[in-house]
Amino acid sequence: MSKMVVLFLAVFLMNSVLMIYCDPDHYIRAGYNHKYPFRICSIAKGTDLMRFDRDISCSPYKSNAKMSEGFFIIYKTNIETYTFPVRTYKKELTFQSSYRDVGVVYFLDRTVMGLAMPVYEANLVNSHAQCYSAVAMKRPDGTVFSAFHEDNNKNNTLNLFPLNFKSITNKRFITTKEPYFARGPLWLYSTSTSLNCIVTEATAKAKYPFSYFALTTGEIVEGSPFFNGSNGKHFAEPLEKLTILENYTMIEDLMNGMNGATTLVRKIAFLEKADTLFSWEIKEENESVCMLKHWTTVTHGLRAETDETYHFISKELTAAFVAPKESLNLTDPKQTCIKDEFEKIINEVYMSDYNDTYSMNGSYQIFKTTGDLILIWQPLVQKSLMFLEQGSEKIRRRRDVVDVKSRHDILYVQLQYLYDTLKDYINDALGNLAESWCLDQKRTITMLHELSKISPSSIVSEVYGRPISAQLHGDVLAISKCIEVNQSSVQLHKSMRVVDAKGVRSETMCYNRPLVTFSFVNSTPEVVPGQLGLDNEILLGDHRTEECEIPSTKIFLSGNHAHVYTDYTHTNSTPIEDIEVLDAFIRLKIDPLENADFKVLDLYSPDELSRANVFDLENILREYNSYKSALYTIEAKIATNTPSYVNGINSFLQGLGAIGTGLGSVISVTAGALGDIVGGVVSFLKNPFGGGLMLILAIVVVVIIIVVFVRQRHVLSKPIDMMFPYATNPVTTVSSVTGTTVVKTPSVKDVDGGTSVAVSEKEEGMADVSGQVSDDEYSQEAALKMLKAIKSLDESYRRKPSSSESHASKPSLIDRIRYRGYKSVNVEEA
């Protein structure tokens, strides 16, 4: 108490001096230690989930329990995936349609098609880093389609070169950087063909029981990578698409092209799936996969024997492993792969730790714990005890022969009795202590579990012995490592009063924790504000405030110093050793077992961790690839072309009630249809083909108009020639028999002064008229007779049978067959 009084008096005096001479805006350097450095503790998105294992069974140790010494090796199930390289081969065809106009080329449809590379072409890739520039595709109906790179109708070889973009897991090699394009003829459509070979060196992963494997490209193969066609491994892909070759030579790395180093593959598989060809090396599963993995080696162990089980206790791991008494024989090849490894570890541990004082007490034994761990136990015995046992056998033999050695016999009995008594006593003590220790640890773990609900970070930090950030997520703890900041950049503010935006300190609001500024390691020198927490933890932000309490004295620990704040202003810093410690630690007074603290913290099993994930990436990728394969040749396009004004009119008419709604629907449908028609016409006119067709139609219409106009002018200039073209034929006479009328027309002189025309007509009830008339004088009667003669002449030509009618009068084939043997009779003769 006297020290505390002196401390506070010193603080009061220093406070008085500093309030006068010290500027509160200055900083002080905050101290830290190696155990609790300045750090930021927060829960990241990807954290480790842990729980306290309270389901611990403490078997009662009887007085006859046997304890033995030794060391053991623990193997766990190997949950790592089997990783192996896979090559994929595909050929990508690009068809670019275009239309060439004057001075411009229009790109139209572009079709990209992927095809799996055939196996014989994959052999060319693996041997020469080349592929062919042609591709052939056979349709189900037997039709074969062929395509050539750059439309040259030649099957050449193309060299593979690495793609600029590559990742750690994938490397791609191609033959064409940019698709080929050719300018077609003017005003015509054309299509350019480009071919690109794509070879990908990917990494595949398979998980036990190896029923499928996934590539880093996201593709899935539903089959075991160890399937060789006859070993019975799971393989769900079509077997007719699988090709297996033996003693296959291939380029190991395509980066150097055909100059790359080659390797001999004992057995390789090629699988054609959708638009890709896969290839991978087929290995023996027992040689490539080991289901067990070394976890840890306990160099100092204790085995306690109960009625049915063994308890293997480790001081190093602070854990106990329970296993049945029946030992195992590892016969599975995927488990015997660890034999050479653990035998080597046994020899190394014995030679380094026990060779001088202990001897191996028999051979090793293999057990399977209740947690499905494989434990290899090597019992040991002290060499001094073994020497006594061997010496007792020699003394007894000599005792049977020589009697003078009886003293030694009595002495040995006493020694043996003492040894047996001490051994039983020690075994009983160790058994009882182990049981009590187990119960105590069980209670301690239960207490830690309950305390973790109050302060999880403190509990977990004490368990691990270093600063750990923990947060309770339901029934489990999410832990993460704290981020250390630049220790030399941490500065502690002297004032704890809140400063507003104008830089004025508040008289009523204060921070409940001191302000600090710091910077991160390997970052810009920009300082970051925060507040000092417990054990040098930095709390981000400065929102932790409270109402100022005057007077008040607060002491905050930082490193090896205690910082005193009086009325929220730093007044003094004193070493932490000056403050007395409340000693609540109860020390164990038993020297042999003073450090035998058993603490059991069990991690989640791999299955539990996998089930705790919200998104199962494997199932998502498998579903995606299944959907991709199912819809490989399907392409859907959806478009909505409803004009915006139609929706506006419909919304307006909906306010008119039911009638308006119905009328609006009708108008919307009608307007939409008209809009589609108009839009289609406009689109057709905008299309080069539609524009060209309309131009041709316009030219045809203009030509028709010109032809009609010229013909009309010709008719107006020469009506007789246009109306009666046969009048210009060199016909001298035309006879027409119509009743008793006969018309004869000799040469007729035209109105322009040609040959004279004499017309004679004999008609019933009319007199014969003959004579010549002049070019310029015609009587009305003569003109009327001329018109009648022209009319009669026209009718005679019209009544003359045409060639088509003459052909129609001929008998048909059926009539000729029907009336064969008969001869047709001329009508005039008849």
UniProtKB/Swiss-Prot annotation:
Disulfide bonds join 41-482, 58-438, 131-197, 290-337, 510-548. The keyword 4Fe-4S does not apply. Keywords: Disulfide bond, Glycoprotein, Host cell membrane, Host endosome, Host Golgi apparatus, Host membrane, Host-virus interaction, Membrane, Signal, Transmembrane, Transmembrane helix, Viral attachment to host cell, Viral envelope protein, Virion, Virus entry into host cell. The chain crosses the membrane at residues 689-709. It is found in: Virion membrane; Host cell membrane; Host endosome membrane; Host Golgi apparatus membrane. Glycans are attached at residues 155, 228, 247, 286, 329, 355, 361, 486. Residues 23-688 are virion surface. GO terms for cellular component: host cell endosome membrane; host cell Golgi membrane; host cell plasma membrane; membrane; viral envelope; virion membrane. Homotrimer; disulfide-linked. Binds to heparan sulfate proteoglycans. Interacts with gH/gL heterodimer. This is Envelope glycoprotein B.
